[in-house]
């Protein structure tokens, strides 16, 4: 059996029907940035507030995904690409169900983020750059990962010995190095209300 033998089954409920019932558009809000920039914190705080306001929302967090779906992947460039490919496909399924998907992944490579953008319709992928200087992320170091990377205990660590390619034209920039996480969360929620309501 090959992929040519597998047939895509159309859903009985369309994306538009879900969106009409939810009273908002579906979208991927792809939070990208260095470890320690605040992606997960901002994503979860925004999701909580949006949920309380009646939005259908889910957070897909990089660490959590690596405990399950992507636990077989390491941190080589190839594994990082596969990590993002898989989560892009999962996010697409949620978009088809009328959900706002907030992802929190370092996703260091522009090409990988672009491939996720191409999975969904125009306007359904919104790149959100959580901007924060490396030195601030290292000072925060909530998981102790930068210290381990500097000591050679973690190879291929983004920002230390593996590159992070900043977004060139993100739909939104949240500067978590200059603004507290509450302000960043509020900016993200305002973006959702303006773009998806």
Swiss-Prot record:
Gene Ontology biological-process entries: hydrogen sulfide biosynthetic process; sulfate assimilation
Chain positions recorded as ATP binding sites: 33-40
Listed Gene3D superfamilies: P-loop containing nucleotide triphosphate hydrolases (3.40.50.300)
CDD domains: APSK
UniProt KW keywords: ATP-binding, Kinase, Nucleotide-binding, Phosphoprotein, Transferase
Reactions this protein catalyses: adenosine 5'-phosphosulfate + ATP = 3'-phosphoadenylyl sulfate + ADP + H(+)
Pathway: Sulfur metabolism; hydrogen sulfide biosynthesis; sulfite from sulfate: step 2/3
Description of what induces expression: Up-regulated by sulfur starvation and repressed by cysteine. Also induced by O-acetyl-L-serine (OAS), a direct precursor of cysteine, maybe via inactivation of a putative transcriptional repressor of the cysH operon whose activity is controlled by the intracellular levels of OAS.
Keyword Cell wall biogenesis/degradation listed: no
InterPro entries: APS_kinase (IPR002891), P-loop_NTPase (IPR027417)
Keyword flag Phosphoprotein: yes
E.C. code: 2.7.1.25
Pfam families: APS_kinase
MF GO annotations: adenylylsulfate kinase activity; ATP binding
Active site: 107
Function per UniProt: Catalyzes the synthesis of activated sulfate.
Homology family: Belongs to the APS kinase family.
Name of the protein described by the UniProt record: Probable adenylyl-sulfate kinase
Organism field: Bacillus subtilis (strain 168)
